[in-house]
Amino acid sequence: MYVVKRDGRQETVHFDKITARLKKLSYGLSSDHCDPVLVAQKVCAGVYKGVTTSQLDELAAETAAAMTCNHPDYASLAARIAVSNLHKNTKKSFSETIKDMFYHVNDRSGLKSPLIADDVFEIIMQNAARLDSEIIYDRDFEYDYFGFKTLERSYLLKVQGTVVERPQHMLMRVAVGIHKDDIDSVIQTYHLMSQRWFTHASPTLFNAGTPRPQLSSCFLVCMKDDSIEGIYETLKECAVISKSAGGIGVSVHNIRATGSYIRGTNGTSNGIVPMLRVFNDTARYVDQGGGKRKGAFAVYLEPWHADVYEFLELRKNHGKEEHRARDLFYALWLPDLFMERVQNNGQWSLFCPNEAPGLADCWGAEFETLYTKYEREGKAKKVVQAQQLWYEILTSQVETGTPYMLFKDSCNRKSNQQNLGTIKSSNLCTEIIEYTSPTETAVCNLASIALPRFVREKGVPLDSHPPKLAGSLDSKNRYFDFEKLAEVTATVTVNLNKIIDVNYYPVETAKTSNMRHRPIGIGVQGLADAFILLGMPFDSPEAQQLNKDIFETIYYHALKASTELAARLGPYETYAGSPVSKGILQPDMWNVIPSDRWDWAVLRDMISKNGVRNSLLVAPMPTASTSQILGNNECFEPYTSNIYSRRVLSGEFVVVNKHLLHDLTDMGLWTPTLKNKLINENGSIVNVAEIPDDLKAIYRTVWEIKQRTVVDMAADRGCYIDQSQSLNIHMDKPNFAKLTSLHFYTWKKGLKTGMYYLRSRAAADAIKFTVDTAMLKEKPSVAEGDKEVEEEDNETKLAQMVCSLTNPEECLACGS
C-alpha cells in the first residue's frame, strides 16, 4: 500500500509516520483524553492504494472531528491537522501569495485574470517586508475545525480551483483592501481580526483587495415606479446587486393591486403576485458571486395593500404553483393603526396604491389622517375585519416561519434618517433601517464584535492571555473587559467608515445613497458564549444587565469615533436636520437615561461641535457564517441546542456545545451514557438527573427560556441600537394565542423589528438512529393529554387569538 506525496513521489504507508505527525500536532492537549494513536488507527483503516498525503490529512482531520464528543481536545486536533495540511499546500510568504494571485492567468482562455486589484498589489509590494513580518501563522491553529472548513470552502481565494491563501493571508488582504497605504491602520486591523476580537462581514472577507471590492452586505431597494419600465429597472438593479453578493430588501407598496385600471393600455393589472414570480426566478438565477450563495430578496408590503392576502400565501407549500414564489422572503411593514384595529377588533380597509396614493410615503399621525380620509371617501377596494387578516398572517407564520414583522412607525420615529423622508423597508435580515427612494438604494457595510473574547481572566495580562476560554466552571475568576470593547468598537467604526469610500458599488443609486448618508452597521456575536463564560444563565438579572452595558458601550464609542471622524473630515452630507444634529440620540427616543459608565455629557458636547460622520451606527445582524468561522454562537441569540449533527464527506457525526462538554469533562461526568441521554433529549439537559442544577440553568436552550425575556432583552438593548436587530422568535408549539400576545408585546415594547423568523419545532420527534437505547433507562410515560394532539379548528384558533388580545397578561404568563 503506498501514498502519493505532495511532490508526486510514491511512498509506502507507515503507521508510525502518521502517528508521529498526529502526536506532533497534539502539543498542549490532554494526553489522558485525546489519543492521537487512536486517530491514526482509524485513519489507517481508511487508507487505499494511491491516496495522497493531502487526502490522508483530510481523513485524519474528519476522524478527529468525529471524536469531538469524546473530548473537546479532539476538535483542536482536527483543526490543527486541517490547517497544517493547508500550510503544506500553500506558500508561507504573504507577498509571494499575492503575486501569484495578481499574475493569475485563466487556464482556459489564456487571458490574465488578476484576483488582486492593481493599487492593492502595488501597496503590498512596496511594503512587502513589513507586512510579511507582521503575520503570525500560528494564529491559524486557533480556528476550530468547522470554522476553518467554512473559510476554506468559501472565503480563501482559489487559483484554478485550488486554495492558495491561508487564513492569515486573507485577513491581511482584507486589512490592506480597507486601509490601502495607511500601513499602521492595516497592521492594527490585521492583529485585531487575527486575534479574533472582531470580524468584517462575509462580502468584505470575500472581496476586499480584489479588482471589484464589493464589501457591502445589505442593499435596500425601492420600487422605481409602478410601470413596466420601473419594475424591470428595479429587477435589473436587484440582479446586478445579487451578482455582487448583496442581500436585498425591496419594498413593493406602490405597485397597483389586482384588477386596477391601467390607463396606458386600457387594461387591468395582474397585481403583485406575477411580478414577484419574476423576481423569484431572478433570485434563483443570479447567485451571490459565482455560486457562493443563492440570491436572496426580502419583499416588504404594508397590510393596507389590496393584494395582501395573496402575498401571505406566496411561500406556502400547498396551492397552485402559479400563485407561489417560494424562493423569496416576505415581510410586513406594519403601521400602528393596523395593530390598533386588530386590538380593538375594528375593520380594516384594503386599498390600491394607484387609487389611494401616498400611504407608503407617510407615517404616524400623517398616515392615519390620509388612511381615514381614503376610508371616508370610499376608496377601499375591500373592507375586512382586521382580526381576520391577522388570522391569515398567523396562519402563514405557523406554516412557513414568515412573514417577518416590522413596525413602520417605530422604524421611522426612532430613526436618525427621519429627516430624509419616510423609510419604506428594512433589508433581507431585518436589522437595517434606512431611507430609500427611486434615486437612492440604501447600503450597509457590516462588522461584528466577538464578545466572548472580551471575557478575561483576572490578573492575566492581555499579551499572555489564552486566545480562547471555555466552560463556566472558572467564571468567578473572570470579568468582562469594557475598556477593550470601547477600543475595538472605535476601530471597527473607523474601518466601516473607510469601506464606504473604497467600496465598489454595483449600481450608481447605491453609491449616491452611501456617500450622502454614510450609515454603518456594528453587530455582535457570541453573547450567549460570553454569558456562559461568566457563569450567567441567559435570562438571569446579571445577564440582562451585562446585555445593556455591552450595547451602551458599543453605541457610545461608535458615536464617539464617528464624531472624532467628523472633526477631521466633516459630518455626513445630510446631517443638518437629523435628530442627532438637534441633540437627540437613540436613548432619548426611547425615553431611557443611560448609566454613568461613560460620560454622555462630554459626548453630546463633542457632537454639537463636530457633528457625526455616519448617520447610523449599530445594527446587530444574524452573523450566520462569520460566527461559525470564529466558533461563537450566533449574534445575541441563546443556544438552540446543546447537541447537533454535522455532515462531512466521511459521514455524519455529533457535536456537543463546547462549553458544556468542557464543564462536564472537568467534573468527570461526561460518559457515552450521558451523551446518549443528551441526544435523546434533543440537546436539552433539563431532564438529565446527573447534571447539577446550576449547570442546567446556565445551559438552558432557547426553547426553555421565556420568549418574553428574550423580547425584554431586545428592548433593553434597543435604546442603544440606532438601526434594528435580527430578532428571531422561538416557539416550541406555536398557537394563535401565544403568537398574538407575543407580537403585541414586541409592538408595545417599542421594538422596530418585532420578529425576524418564527422558529418552531415539530410536535413529533424524529427517529434518533444515533441513540444507543440500551444505555437509556426506561422513561416515564408521557401524560395522556399530550398523546392526543388534536387538530385545532379555525374557531378555536380565533378564540385563542381574541383571548390573548383581551387578556394579554394572562396569555403571556402561559409561556410565550
From Swiss-Prot:
Binding site for dTTP: 226-228, 243, 256, 263-264
A Pfam family recorded for this sequence: ATP-cone
Ranges where the ATP-cone domain occurs: 1-92
Keyword Oxidoreductase annotated: yes
Assembly behavior: Heterotetramer of two large/R1 and two small/R2 subunits. A radical transfer pathway may occur between 'Tyr-125' of protein R2 and R1.
Positions with a binding annotation for ATP: 5-6, 11-17, 53, 57
Organism: Arabidopsis thaliana (Mouse-ear cress)
Keywords, alphabetical: Allosteric enzyme, ATP-binding, Cytoplasm, Deoxyribonucleotide synthesis, Disulfide bond, Nucleotide-binding, Oxidoreductase
Site (Interacts with thioredoxin/glutaredoxin): 811, 814
Residues involved in GDP binding: 202, 217, 427, 431, 623-626
Catalytic activity, as annotated: a 2'-deoxyribonucleoside 5'-diphosphate + [thioredoxin]-disulfide + H2O = a ribonucleoside 5'-diphosphate + [thioredoxin]-dithiol
Protein name: Ribonucleoside-diphosphate reductase large subunit
Classification via NCBIfam families: NrdE_NrdA
Record PANTHER family: RIBONUCLEOSIDE-DIPHOSPHATE REDUCTASE LARGE CHAIN (PTHR11573), RIBONUCLEOSIDE-DIPHOSPHATE REDUCTASE LARGE SUBUNIT (PTHR11573:SF6)
Other facts: Two distinct regulatory sites have been defined: one controls substrate specificity and the other regulates the overall catalytic activity. A substrate-binding catalytic site, located on R1, is formed only in the presence of the second subunit R2.
Post-translational modifications reported in the UniProt record: Contains a disulfide bonds. Binding of the substrate occurs primarily when the active-site cysteines are reduced.
Function: Provides the precursors necessary for DNA synthesis. Catalyzes the biosynthesis of deoxyribonucleotides from the corresponding ribonucleotides. R1 contains the binding sites for both substrates and allosteric effectors and carries out the actual reduction of the ribonucleotide. Ribonucleotide reductase (RNR) complex function is essential for efficient organellar DNA degradation in pollen. Involved in chloroplast division.
Annotated GO CC locations: cytoplasm
